Regions:
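Short loop/turn microsegments at loop-to-beta-strand junctions
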Residues: 46-48, 77, 165-166
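Oxidative protein folding and maturation machinery
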Residues: 1-65
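Extended hydrophobic-aromatic, low-complexity segments
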Residues: 79, 87-92, 122-125, 178-181
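A structural signal for short secondary-structure junctions
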Residues: 72-73, 105-108, 129-132, 160-164
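Short acidic-hydrophobic, aromatic-tinged amphipathic segments that line or gate anion-handling sites
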Residues: 138-142, 181
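Thiol/disulfide oxidoreductase modules built on the thioredoxin-like
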Residues: 146-192
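Short active-site neighborhood of thiol/selenol oxidoreductases, capturing the structured segment around
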Residues: 65-96, 111-113
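Structural microenvironment flanking redox-active thiols in thiol-disulfide oxidoreductases
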Residues: 90-131, 147-153
Length: 198
């Protein structure tokens, strides 16, 4: 966790300033592109809001209501990316839910902003009901072009480095990233360390 900041620093300081002569131009473009994509969501920075290419919020719940990260008023926000048909998600989401319910029962003020990463609305709704996560803010970017093909509203997958699921980000009350790409077991551990230091 947090090694992406080292990667971005190395790219900005050495690679794109032509101090790495062993890297060919094709590879350099790939490295620089990746660093540019993940730089906005490094630990300690405010999590990127889900805005479309025109700067408008676009993540909608199952009823079509738009939601944003900033609307959440809690000491902590768990940002969860999951795929309803992902086998690993089917196992991990109930564990995440149990962990959060335990934290909430001890008085921790935490809310969940859960992003479905797939384009099948029926599967997404079924997953929410089956996994009993209806108390989370469940949103998705389910849009299709005129021919019925899935279309993303923004580059949020790149910004949040979502190439597999589930992925968890822990945010503070100001939506700054405390931790990212953590396991469900680390949620309580990290919050415990923070709460213990207050």
């Amino acid at each position: 966790m947090g090694m992406d900041a080292v990667f971005v620093h190395m790219v900005e300081k050495y690679y794109i300033t032509n101090q790495c002569d062993w890297v060919d131009s094709t590879q350099l473009v790939k490295i620089a592109d990746r660093a540019q994509k993940i730089a906005p969501n490094l630990i300690g920075r405010e999590a990127s809001e889900f805005l479309d290419f025109y700067g408008r919020p676009f993540m909608k719940d199952t009823l079509g209501k738009t939601h944003t990260l900033q609307e959440i008023k809690a000491n902590y926000t768990l940002l969860v990316f999951y795929g309803p048909t992902c086998g690993h998600c089917k196992k991990e989401i109930p564990r995440i839910k149990n962990e959060l319910d335990s934290l909430i029962s001890t008085g921790v003020n935490i809310k969940t902003f859960a992003v479905g990463t797939e384009f099948d609305k029926a599967e997404w709704k079924k997953f929410i009901n089956t996994k009993e996560i209806g108390d989370w803010i469940n949103v998705s970017d389910i849009n299709h072009d005129d021919e019925g093909n899935p279309v993303a509203s923004s580059d949020w997958r790149d910004k949040y480095d979502i190439y597999s699921t589930p992925v968890l980000y822990l945010l503070d009350k100001d939506k700054k990233i405390i931790a990212k790409r953590i396991s469900y077991k680390q949620i309580t551990e990290i919050i415990g360390k923070i709460e213990g230091n207050k």
